Amino acid sequence: MIKHKRLRRASALFAALSALLLSGCAPSAASDSALPALTVGSDTYPPYVYMDNNGDITGLDVEIAEEAFRRMGYRAEFTTIDWEKKTELVDSGEIDCIWDCFSMEGRENDYQWAGPYLVSRQVVAVDAQSGIETMSDLAGKTIAVQATGKPEAIFLRGGADVPAFRNIISLADRGVQYAMLDCGYTDAIAAHEEAIRQYMKDYGANFRILDEPLLVTGIGVAFSKNDTRGLAAQLNEVFEQMREDGSMEKLVGKYLDDPAHSLEVDALEQ
């Protein structure tokens, strides 16, 4: 009988200790959820931002944002937006920032920027069996791009360094351009290189990326020009910390097969 009492006491003590240990592990998640939220406007753009099999938003930019904002005393709350209305949304305060592999090139004066925190190449992809080998081969061809994206701006701007294409198809849903190339409805597409590679990996698409990039650019986080909270400056400081302590490299390596090029931010300034 005494042994049974001791056993029950030991079991109760173990249960109490377990509860204490579990409650000790919980504050991190609980404290994060209690932090004030910053609403991040984004679009679906694997591997940077996408929905996993559980229906949760994840990706490289999501994890960087969560870690960076946590260090600033905030939590990141991602929301999918109409990409064509991104500037209107951030200026109205409906979202706090735009964060989704967002190219800074040519938009330097449109927002308050944090970044660049990574490097991205804007490239052209064609069907693997296509006879298009160089940019000059795009003359007379149809190219699909995302509306208001950087490739659209490059092609519509024109110039000596831009091929004399026949037609540009601008799409509100950036994912549609991949399907169009896959089905032969366009001769080429233009987008961030890692996004194209992710589509090829996920769907087994037989694309070929042209060697010559359209643009090598820094990607950043855009806040409204009228924002007075100093968030862009704080985020720049955190990005520097994350580069120095290796956490940025660790996160990039989790999503990209060859992370080294994406981390060469300093080379952009040379």
What are these regions (language model features)?
Residues 21-24:
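C-terminal motif of bacterial Sec signal peptides marking the signal peptidase cleavage site
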Residues 42-44, 119-126, 197, 201-240, ...:
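Periplasmic-binding protein-like
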Residues 31-101, 170, 234, 245:
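Extracytoplasmic small-molecule ligand-binding "clamshell" domains
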Residues 26, 62-71, 132, 136-137, ...:
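Extended ligand-binding regions for polar small-molecule ligands
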Residues 85-88, 101-110, 154-159, 180-182, ...:
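A ligand-binding cleft/hinge motif common to bilobed small-molecule-binding domains
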Residues 70-71, 79-80, 84-97, 112, ...:
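Short helices/loops that flank or line small-molecule/ion binding pockets
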Residues 51-54, 65-74, 151-172, 200-204:
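Ligand-binding cleft/hinge of the Venus flytrap
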Residues 66, 75-137, 208, 213:
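Acidic, polar ligand-binding/catalytic clefts
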